[in-house]
């Protein structure tokens, strides 16, 4: 079997091993693949693995040997799954591999914002503590999480794990979820979307990107939030209208935002969030702990093994 990995660098920049994949067939690994290189590199392949390289209906039509597309991520909108189904091509994804890591990033942003860890460390290194008259100093508001309300937009694996961490901090947890009150643990209360935005101290986004959720965080909803509120996004960049968020931050409509994803990645130089007040941005690394990437690669190998055995797993285009 000919296997082509089109953009393997993000998952494995060199600190992990592809050996488990190589034993499954003739495996060629590219760090990155430009759109115009897809057909040449994938020619003759029965199996393609992609992270962010788009595979569309035209590609599939030009690759008659293609029978399997493995997405090296949970989200699979880079593949035209309907076209793949029409052609009998199996498409799989990697579910739940980074749940703990993403929840950890949610609270990395929350704790950095509420305790201003980065800011105060930088000020210490500038000499401000050394030259201070008191045994301590702070020059920004510091917030305790206990009894604060956190609103989770979505309560899948990552949302639920985030909820458990929040409960550990003594927070009041509310969630937008299709589950009934009776299906939720007593520590998690159900709430509708507008109510979450108007009542919660922290909003964390954990829902998929769909036509309905695109730019769900807009000027109207940001206007509902408390001026002391914090917005966290480790989900999908386009869930937020970035200009509206920048305006809300710059005008003091909300206190701060912590985002790990943007609408375009890498961001354009004129992305308004890059210069927005109290906007903390990490470069889409919530998923990228070594433990999560090891898990991703192991599941990717297992998915292809299952396909070869005639019992494919984690299919997204049944």
Feature-to-residue mapping (PLM):
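NAD(P)-dependent dehydrogenase/reductase Rossmann-like domain
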Residues: 296, 302-318
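Rossmann-like adenosine-cofactor binding region
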Residues: 55-60, 172, 179-272
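Phosphate-binding beta-alpha-beta segment of Rossmann-like dinucleotide-binding domains, i.e.
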Residues: 87, 95-149, 316
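N-terminal glycine-/charge-rich "phosphate-binding" loop or analogous flexible N-terminal tail
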Residues: 1-45, 172-174
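Short beta->alpha connector loops at strand-helix junctions that form conserved
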Residues: 31, 72-73, 89-100, 177
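Hydrophobic/small residue at the entry helix of a nucleotide-binding pocket
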Residues: 158
